Every structure is written in structure tokens, then in C-alpha cells.
Amino acid sequence: MIKVRHPVGKGRRIQLVTGRVHPKLAKDISDRLEVPLSDVEVSNFANGEVRLRVNESLRGDDVFIIQAHYGPIHEALFEQLLMIDAAKRASARSITAVCPFLGYARQDRKAGGREPIGARLIIDMLTAAGADRIMSVDLHSGQTQGFFNGPFDHLIAMPIFKRWITENYNPKDIVMVSPDAGRVKMSERYSTSLGTDLAIIHKHRSTTVKNKSEARYLIGDVKGKICMTFDDMIDTAGTITTAAELLLKQGAKEVIALSTHGVFSGPALERLKGSKFSKIVVSDTLPAPANDAGGKIVTLSIAPLIADTIAAIFADESVSALFEGNNQI
């Protein structure tokens, strides 16, 4: 890692600014960089409007504004927009919007007539507020990077998942499983990096019921193997729970879910608790869930990857080198 200390007095400085969504992650990033979090006051007016003030100078500084789009998602997003605007008006040298989880990322295209492209709108809002650069982790699709006319640093959680896998399992016993066609490329990278076999599940999404899909067919041999599925996010957990059942029916010894973003909406935690998964491994791009699904959820820290990327940007070093060139999707 590139060491970046927070100098006193004149000269280029990193400023880490964060809102109310995920203070623990921001603190972990701060500790890794040995750079204190900037003093920011965030509250709400009686009518719900966000009130924000940065209580220290940002003039000439490289400002990194950390905020996952989660919880009351629109308030989280608007907090970040206000922080960006405040930094811009305070004459910051550069402003990077650090969005560990980018809201509306699934709405990256028109799936039907008269539908918006939400991901493009979010990027346009960050741009209009004054962001010079955007950083996010495991986007739903690579095309979202093209919505921004500036540097877009795409991080992947593969290094932390790979470390956890090799510390706890023998790769020879594992089959990496893509839960749908959209995750094949990334699942193949995991498979190649770890030296495991690869299997693919064909998923059918309901045309009549929202947020409902099921695993239909399996391509590949999983008999007697530990299957590890990878997806960018777990939302309602409907798809992956049916995937676990399919894999066990095909002879898998054990099934483990890997997912960068543990969104865990609605019935997700109860579904996972009653599912066939032995473990659900997620990163902490989002705050910890209300419960751990009966002890099944394992959380890994994404802070070192984000901190090292911030350090690389500040030092004008390569970001792709941190991920061995695997951070393109």
C-alpha cells in the first residue's frame, strides 16, 4: 500500500468527507490511510430537508466524499450531492465521489418502452453537483462507466474474496458457479485466478411477478464439490436460494454464496436463514444487516481496497495494478 499521511500546513492534502449512511466503513478507510475524517455536520430541518456544513477548509485539497446509496436511498444520495456541492464551493482541488454501492445501477438500460435509464441520471446528478471523478465497487454492468465523462475507477472485491477462499478451502475442491449469464465473465475470472472448474446456471425471470426468478438449468459438473456462486448483489435472495437447491440436487457437497453488496431487502434474511447455503459471504460496502441469517453471514472488509485506491489516485499511481488488471467488466 502507498502510505499517505495528512500533512499539517500548506501543500496537497487528502480530505475524507462522509455522510451518515456508513460511518464504520469511512472510519476504517480513514484508519488505513492514517488520514482523519473531516469534521462535517449533517442533520435535517423540520421538513426533512438535509442540512450540511463542513467545519474545516477544503481549499486546494483532494476531497474524497464517501457515501453508499443505501437506507433511505434518496436521502443518502442527496447528502452526497450536497457534500460535493459544498466541496466545490469551498475551492477543493479535486472531488471524487466514492460510492461503494452505486444506487440505481441496475437501471443501466431501457428494458421496455417508456422507461428511464436511472443509472445515467444518477451519474448526471453527481456530475452536475461537481464530481471530477467517481469510484465504485463491482458495478452491475460495465456500461455505467460510460455515462460519466471523466475518470471512473471501478473496483472489484475479488482480492478479498479470493483471500478468504484460499485461507479456508482447497481450490481443488471448489467449483465457481455463475448464477446467471450476466455473471459468467467475472465468475470465469475467479475460476481462472483460483484454478477451479466453472459451472453456469441458466436463470428464468418471471414476466408476471416482480423481483421473481428461478434457476432452471445447470451447465457443468458439480458432483461432490463445494460450489461457490458469485453475484454483484443479494437483494431479495429469491434467485440464489433456488440456485442452491439446484446445485445440491445435482450432487454438490456444499453451497456458498459470495456477493459484494448485501442489500438484503424484504424477505432476504429469512430466505437465506432457511436456505441450503452453508455460508453467505459479503463485503461491507453496505452497513451490516439487522441479523446474520442464523449465523450464515460472513462479512469481509472492503476498506483496504478503497483506501489503497484513494492512495493510488492521490499519488498518481495505477489503480488497475491493484487488481492485476481484472477490474474491467
Describe the predicted segments one by one.
Residues M1-I329:
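PRPP-associated nucleotide enzymes
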